Regions:
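Charge-rich, low-complexity amphipathic helices
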Residues: 13, 20, 24, 170-171, ...
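Short, solvent-exposed loop/turn segments at secondary-structure junctions
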Residues: 7-9, 110-114, 163-166, 174
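Catalytic active-site module of serine/aspartate enzymes centered on a nucleophile-bearing elbow/loop
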Residues: 143-187
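Alpha/beta-hydrolase
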Residues: 15-147
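Active-site nucleophile loop of the alpha/beta-hydrolase fold
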Residues: 2-12
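A general structural signal marking secondary-structure boundaries and capping sites
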Residues: 10, 14, 30, 186-187
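Short beta-strand segments
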Residues: 3-4, 105-109, 159
Length: 187
């Protein structure tokens, strides 16, 4: 099993770690980028949105990922963000996994990168929110990684400092190295 930024309580919960509610509450601490105006050139097309993401985050989301997140206007511009059913709906009735008896690789971003726009911001409110979020994220995600590591003796847990949630995009070389190393132990 390979968990790319997915070793959270929905995937492993033996009752000793943080809850999904704690992770959902954490999202509220994160600084929020101001929404783009409808005339923003970054919304002219999905390719333009990818380039805007590259400037803001330092990497690009695949076009398919963006098309799942955003609607398309009749003139092919990027539209509004789609309503996601939400974590609560998605997680309702999910089986709790408290035992994983197979080899596993779990890669965590600890702490998560907040994006170039946050690093470049000089706004005091953004800086304060970023600091609070980073401290809470570090504590909570470190706790979950430790619970995963202690609760799944067959796991190799990797912590990538400052990676994005999309670790395979922000830290592709690290992910490939860890995957190759993990797969070599299965032979």
């Amino acid at each position: 099993l390979v968990y790319l930024e997915a070793g959270y309580p929905y995937a492993f919960d033996n009752g000793t770690g943080p809850t999904m509610k704690e992770f959902q509450d954490l999202k509220n601490l994160a600084p929020k980028a101001p929404p783009p105006s409808e005339s923003d050139p970054g919304l002219a097309s999905f390719a333009a949105l990818q380039q805007a993401g590259l400037r803001a985050l330092g990497f690009t989301y695949p076009e398919g990922e963006l098309r799942q997140r955003f609607t398309t206007t009749p003139d092919e511009r990027v539209g509004k963000e789609r309503d996601f059913p939400g974590d609560a709906t998605m997680l309702e009735g999910m089986k709790k996994y408290a035992d994983i008896p197979v080899p596993a690789l779990a890669i965590f971003a600890i702490p998560h990168d907040q994006g170039k726009w946050v690093h470049d911001s000089t706004g005091p409110k953004v800086r304060e929110a970023a600091k609070a979020y980073s401290a809470a994220d570090l504590a909570l995600t470190t706790r979950q990684a430790k619970v995963f590591e202690e609760g799944v003796p067959t796991a190799h847990v990797v912590r990538l400092r400052g990676a994005d949630h999309y670790v395979y995009l922000s830290n592709e070389a690290d992910v490939l190295r860890e995957l190759k190393s993990f797969l070599s132990t299965l032979r």
